[in-house]
């Protein structure tokens, strides 16, 4: 395993994945909050085939001539993906198969590895994906409760 900060994303990370290596990155920003908290969590990613992807998977992909992004699959069509961050409501897409670099296999939180096959993770991530249209209401309620 090689741990690399996502601020240093480069062709090297893409090459490591292409070579079949599992990488660990520390996601930056809050687009995948509450799954990932910047500075706390590490995402474990490995190469994947487009045909093995399913709704709810978190994948690493490259936007056209732009940055690498780690978001969740909202919808899959025959040859396209539609993505959403866990802290977002806007759907991004369509993405092509050639933009996919890898898939989340687990993450490290407070020194402990959590596999994406973990039943609690699967349930909460499926529920959060289902509740996408209600996220703004949820965050508004949380801000009121914190006061």
Positions of the model-derived regions?
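Extended hydrophobic leader/signal-anchor segments used for secretion and membrane insertion
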Residues: 1-147
């Amino acid at each position: 395993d090689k741990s690399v900060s996502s601020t240093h994303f480069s062709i090297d990370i893409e090459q490591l994945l292409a070579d079949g290596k599992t990488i660990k990155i520390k996601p930056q920003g809050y687009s995948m909050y509450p799954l990932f908290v910047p500075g706390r969590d590490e995402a474990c990613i490995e190469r994947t085939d487009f045909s093995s992807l399913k709704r709810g998977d978190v994948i690493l992909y490259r936007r056209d001539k732009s940055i690498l992004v780690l978001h969740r699959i909202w919808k899959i069509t025959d040859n396209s993906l539609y993505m959403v961050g866990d802290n977002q409501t806007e759907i991004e897409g369509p993405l092509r198969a050639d933009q996919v670099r890898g898939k989340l296999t687990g993450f490290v939180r407070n020194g402990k590895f959590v596999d994406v096959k973990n039943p609690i993770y699967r349930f909460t991530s499926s529920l959060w994906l289902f509740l996408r249209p209600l996220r703004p209401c949820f965050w508004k309620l949380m801000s009121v409760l914190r006061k």
